[in-house]
Every structure is written in C-alpha cells, then in structure tokens.
Curated annotation (Swiss-Prot):
Protein name: Type 2 DNA topoisomerase 6 subunit B
GO biological process: DNA topological change
Region forming the signal peptide: none
Species assigned in the record: Pyrococcus furiosus (strain ATCC 43587 / DSM 3638 / JCM 8422 / Vc1)
Subunit details: Homodimer. Heterotetramer of two Top6A and two Top6B chains.
Gene: top6B
The keyword DNA repair is annotated on this UniProt entry: no
Function: Relaxes both positive and negative superturns and exhibits a strong decatenase activity.
Length: 568
C-alpha cells in the first residue's frame, strides 16, 4: 500500500491563469469561429465601457488581417481615456482583476477575466505577446508587449518603448496574433457581433476592416452618451453570511451598527434596532424551544412582523438577550464572529425591507433602441418597451427592455439577445430570453408564424449582476422574475405591432376593393350607357366620385408590391 507522503508528491497549487489556460473553453474559446468572436467581444466591450465611464462618445475600429490558414492578427483601437502605464500589466495580464469585478455596479464585463483571457488565448495559440499602444492624452505614448506568467497569474511586459505625443492622442490600441480561428460572415461571426453591438449602442461609431480589406462602417445614430452607471450598496436580502463577515472585517467603520447603516442599502439606525430584536428572538427560540412545530410557528410569526409579541412570550428573559445583541452592534466590525454574521443574515431573511434602489441601472432606453434598430435594420415598423426596474433573488436589481422591428429590409425572424448591451451569440437554447420569446403565442398578435415572419425581437437584460449560466457569459439563467418581466415587455410591444398590422391590413383591404371597382368600371359604364343613353365619361366620373367617397384609404406603410401580390 502506498504511503500518504508518496501520494502527495505530485500535489501542486494551480493559479487562476493556469486553470483557464487548460480550460479556455469555459471562457468561450471553443471552435474556430467562436474563439475569434470572443477575442473581439472582450476587446470591444472593454473599449465601450472605458469610453462611457470617461464620458466619451465611443469610436471603435476593428481590423482583422489574415496571416495564414486559421491564423489572424486582430487589431482593436478606441478613443477612450487610455491606460496609465503602471496598470498595463494588470489590465492585460492578470485574471480576476479590473475596475468592476469587486463593485456592485452595472457593466458589460463583471468577472475581471475578459481581456486578459484574450491575451492568454493569443499567447497559447501563437506564442506571441500582445502589443498595447496607449496614452492618457499626456506627452507620451506607451508601446508595450505583454505576456501572462500563468504560474503567478501576473502580467509581464517583455518590451516597452515610449514615444512623444505632440498631438496629445488619447486612447488604446491592442494587437493580438491568434491561431486556430476562422473569419466567416456567419450568425456567430465577428461581423454579426459588431452589427448587433451597433444596434444596442447607437451612440458608438464602429468600424470593421475585414481580411479582404473591405471597410464596413456602423455610424452612430445618437449623440447622447449614456450616463455612467452608479455603484450600489448591497441589499440585505441579497447577501450571504460570508458577504457580511468579509465586508465587516474589511470595514473602516467604528462599530457594527455604523457598518450596517453605511455599507448596506435600506438599513437605517431604526432598522438596526429592529434587527437587534429579531436576532434576540431567534436566539431565544433556538435556546429555549425544542419542539420543532412550535419553533416553526414562532419563526413564521417573526416573518409576519410579530417580533415584539414573540419576545414577550419568553417572559423576562428577552430583555437580557436584547442587551447581549445590542453589545454586538457596538463592537468594532472586524471583531464580528462568523456565528454573529450568520445570525444577522438569518434575521435579514425574516425582516421586511424596501426594495433595493435601482438608480444605478442604465438601460438603453426606448428611443435609442428604436434608433438602433431603424438605422441598422431599416424596418417599416419599430417599437420599444422599457419595463420598470425589479429585483430577483430577493435583492439584486434588474431591468428588462424589448424592441420589435418588422418588415422593410428584414426578411426573416431573429431573436437578438443582450445582457447590459452586450450581444449574446451562443448557447441560445439554454437562455431565458429564448424561452420567453418562444413562449409567446405570436398568432394573437397577427404574426401567423414567428419563424417565417420578417420580425426581429431584441431583448436586453440590465443588472449589476447578470445571472449567466457559465463563465462564457453567453446565456442567462432561467430565473422566474426575469422570465416574467421579459414576457410582459414582449406582450406590450407585440400589442403595438398587432395594432400596426391591423391598420395595415385594413388599408390593404380598402386598396384592393378600390382597385377591383376601378377594374370593372369601364364595363359598367359601357353597359349603363347602352341602357340609359348617358355618356360613358359622365357615368365613369359619377362612379369614381362615389368610390372615393365610400372608400377612404390611407396608403402610408402599404407598398404597391403588397397590393399587387394581394390581387394575385
């Protein structure tokens, strides 16, 4: 039998970078087409986030050069705020690092993996460092070649050059060389990804230079820079014991009371006083009550707000226990124990709080959705709905918005899925957006067959924490609150589509009736001329006036082709 020491000879600590190097598929690097799209996605989302946080209208240029079979150079340049020199190795070479991952704030990226994952993918497929050119608008441009030390999860600058910046250029340009990828104009390729990005970000000017040198421009259709999202404090209903314990031990506040009031939303001094009573009641129930049925009844009464009655049911003991808990609230937060953090969270679950604030959410907006869909897809009809903010899992705010575009240059149906304005191109089958759209009975809204209709449905889920199904961030988990909000938004937009189509069909019917009458009018006039002796022209004029007075047609939105097809 082998000894324990022999078994552990191969024991090794693996860094985050090393883990993802071996499991790149978890980040979306799977398949030649998807891998290239993922590289572009990570770079473009970084650019858009940086521009918006700095209050800059984004200009993003993507160039793809073919170097060989399944071998490309990818260049992404933006006009953002630039990256300070000291942060270059951290931004591009350290996983789980960034300006957003640790904050309760809406953003396109939320894990701190994105662009460093792209750098790592380039490194393990081509062996080349990523070239970064950046300036914050000062008198220097920094050019650096970055690699990742996967064992240490650290960025390493292998070469650096500084250039003068007389024109005060500001922005960032990155160049990655990647292999085992392929550029195609498919629904999962780079072109389609950038097209969908332009729809959801009408304030951005996006350019794509394809491998054959063709330039494609998605011009901005809005000059309004989205307001930067605001960091929001966590809500008591959305935290776990570890959250409270970790936050308390990092807090600079003088007491647990001040920590709770200042670092959580919807908690005031009065609410802390109430929290003390709930913790005291739970302590008494756990200490004094052995009968499980009675224990369940008392906890149910707490959930119904009867905390004072429950406390008094224990006689004089309750005041002493309340004093014990009050002492916890006055001690330094770094001395909060795990058990005390557990008690706080258990009490939170039973207490009633106002819904978390949603001021930090930044939806695209109905007007901008309509602008984006109209400028890129050129439909005959477009509408958008932005639902009021809601919460899921007790305390995480989110918001749903929907756009519908119909007809015009649209030839087939599409579901455009977004999370915080970012297109989701893959794993559609497991996404709550797909299931919500498919659950709608579109025939009720004058769309006989969704799959065959010239109809595009856009759904954007906005949240400080989008519940993705995996680290690849391409599919949103099926959460009831989100599913229901998507359905409500879809039905509201679909009712507007039905009203438009109803009016269109009525106009079409009237035009067809008029054309039928006009078609047979010469024969009717000739016959009446023979019977009455009245001149044919006079009879024609009479009936034309009669037709005009009886059939009023507003032809807006109805093409001649549609009329002719209807007659056939």
């Amino acid at each position: 039998m082998a000894e324990a020491r022999d078994l552990f000879k191969e024991f090794k600590v693996q860094s985050v970078s090393e883990f993802f190097r071996r499991n790149a598929a978890m980040l979306g690097y799977t398949g030649s087409i998807r891998s290239l799209t993922t590289v572009i996605h990570e770079a473009v989302t970084n650019s858009l986030d940086a521009c918006e946080e700095a209050g800059i209208l984004p200009y993003v240029r993507v160039e793809i050069e073919e170097l060989g079979k399944e071998h490309y150079k990818v260049i992404v340049e933006d006009n953002g705020p630039g990256i300070p020199e000291d942060y270059i190795p951290h931004v591009f070479g350290k996983m789980l690092a960034g300006t957003k991952a640790h904050r309760n704030i809406q953003s396109r990226g939320q894990q701190g993996i994105g662009i460093s994952g792209a750098v790592m993918f380039a490194q393990i497929t081509s062996g080349k460092a990523t070239r970064v050119i950046t300036s914050t608008g000062d008198d220097e441009i920094v050019e650096a070649w970055v690699k990742i030390d996967v064992q240490k999860n650290e960025g390493k600058i292998v070469k650096k050059i500084k250039h003068p910046n007389p024109k005060r250029w500001r922005g960032t340009r990155i160049e990655l060389e990647v292999k085992n990828v392929k550029y195609v104009r498919s629904k999962q390729g780079v072109y389609w990804y950038l097209k969908l990005t332009a729809i959801a970000n009408p304030h951005a000017h996006i350019e794509l230079v394809e491998p054959d040198g063709k330039l494609i421009v998605f011009p901005r259709s809005s000059e309004d820079i989205p307001e930067p999202p605001v960091e929001m404090k966590p809500h008591p209903k959305g935290v776990m014991t570890d959250d409270v314990y970790t936050m308390a031990h990092r807090s600079k506040r003088s007491t647990v009371r001040r920590f709770l009031v200042s670092e959580f939303s919807r908690i005031s001094d009065k609410k802390v006083d109430e929290l003390v009573l709930y913790i005291a009641a739970l302590r008494l129930i756990n200490r004094e009550v052995t009968d499980q049925n009675l224990k369940s009844q008392l906890i149910e009464r707490l959930a119904n707000g009867e905390v004072e009655k429950v406390l008094k049911s224990f006689g004089r003991k309750w005041k002493k226990v309340v004093e014990e808990v009050e002492k916890i609230m006055e001690k330094p937060p770094e001395k909060l124990t795990w058990h005390e953090a557990e008690e706080i969270v258990e009490a939170f679950k039973l207490m009633k709080f106002l819904a978390p604030p949603t001021y930090g959410l930044r939806p695209i907006g109905e007007e901008n959705i309509e602008k984006g869909l109209s400028s890129i897809l050129r439909p005959e009809f477009v509408t958008a709905v932005t639902r009021p903010p809601k919460v899921y899992s007790g305390g995480i705010p989110f918001q749903v918005e929907v756009g519908i575009a119909y007809g015009g240059e649209i030839t087939n149906s599409e579901i455009l899925r977004y999370a915080n304005r970012v297109p989701l191109l893959f794993d559609a089958g497991s996404c709550v957006i797909t299931s919500a759209v498919r659950s709608i009975d579109w025939r009720r809204y004058r769309v006989e067959s969704f799959d065959n209709a010239p109809l595009v449905v856009l759904v954007n889920v906005v949240s400080v924490h989008v519940p993705y199904t995996s680290t690849g961030k391409q599919s949103i988990a099926s959460i009831d609150e989100i599913y229901n909000e998507i359905r409500l938004a879809l039905m509201e937009a679909a009712r507007r589509l039905a009203a438009y189509l109803g009016g269109k069909y009525r106009r079409l019917y009237q035009i067809r009736r008029k054309k039928i009458f006009e078609k047979y009018l010469p024969e009717i006039a000739r016959s009446l001329h023979i019977l009455t002796g009245e001149p044919e022209e006079k009879i024609k004029e009479y009936f034309l006036r009669l037709i005009e007075s009886k059939i009023t047609v507003a032809q807006e939105g109805v093409s001649e082709v549609e009329v002719e097809e209807g007659e056939a």
